[in-house]
Regions:
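Intrinsically disordered, low-complexity regions
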Residues: 3, 12, 16-17, 23, ...
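Short, low-complexity N-terminal intrinsically disordered segments enriched in polar/charged residues
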Residues: 2-55, 67, 152-154
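Non-cytosolic beta-sheet module surface loops
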Residues: 57-59, 114-115
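Short solvent-exposed beta->alpha transition segments
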Residues: 39, 47-57, 63-108
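Exposed beta-sheet edge and beta->alpha loop/turn motif
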Residues: 91-92, 100-161
Length: 161
């Protein structure tokens, strides 16, 4: 091969390498951009889910609230018992205001909220692609209450039943 042929081959190789490198860089940026967009969409979805959860809780729509519990939380109290206890001991109709969402440990997202000046932290995580509320992390004291006999539960909360 002559000198001109070698220069042509070298030029093609360098051009091809530059093209591949450029494609890799663009792919990296695109996947990063896609990951950022997906994370933003996921956070937006969580915000909507948590807002619905809080609104239902404030309205005493207890079945839909329990439905958003994760399996660990649903194992603590049955849906029927949760609904019954909350129907007989309703909460005031004020929903907390979401102030932000932050990344927590072990795949949980923390929905930061305020309610009448009290700061609350609800822990949510994806289960099968759906945001689910974790009672044990969000409100550990509720677990002890739900395990009490009904009469003691109502007495402890000052409810009539």
């Amino acid at each position: 091969m002559g000198k001109t042929t070698w220069l042509l081959v070298l030029g093609l190789l360098l051009g091809g390498a530059a093209l591949v490198a450029g494609m890799v860089l663009l792919a990296g940026r695109t996947s990063s951009s896609i990951a950022t967009q997906q994370n933003n969409m996921t956070t937006a979805t969580l915000q909507v889910r948590a807002t619905t959860f809080n609104t239902d809780y404030a309205r005493n729509a207890d079945g839909p609230v329990w439905d958003l519990f994760d399996p660990q939380s649903q194992a603590i109290i049955s849906r029927a018992d949760y609904v019954d206890r909350h129907q007989h001991c309703p909460r005031p109709g004020v929903a907390p205001r979401i102030t932000g969402i932050s990344t927590g440990p072990n795949g949980y997202e923390i929905v930061n909220e305020t309610l009448s000046g009290t700061v609350l932290h609800d822990y949510w995580h994806l289960v099968g692609g759906t945001w689910r509320f974790n009672l044990a992390r969000s409100n550990p004291s509720a677990i002890a209450l739900y395990r009490e006999p009904r009469a003691k539960y109502f007495a402890d909360l000052g409810c009539t039943k």
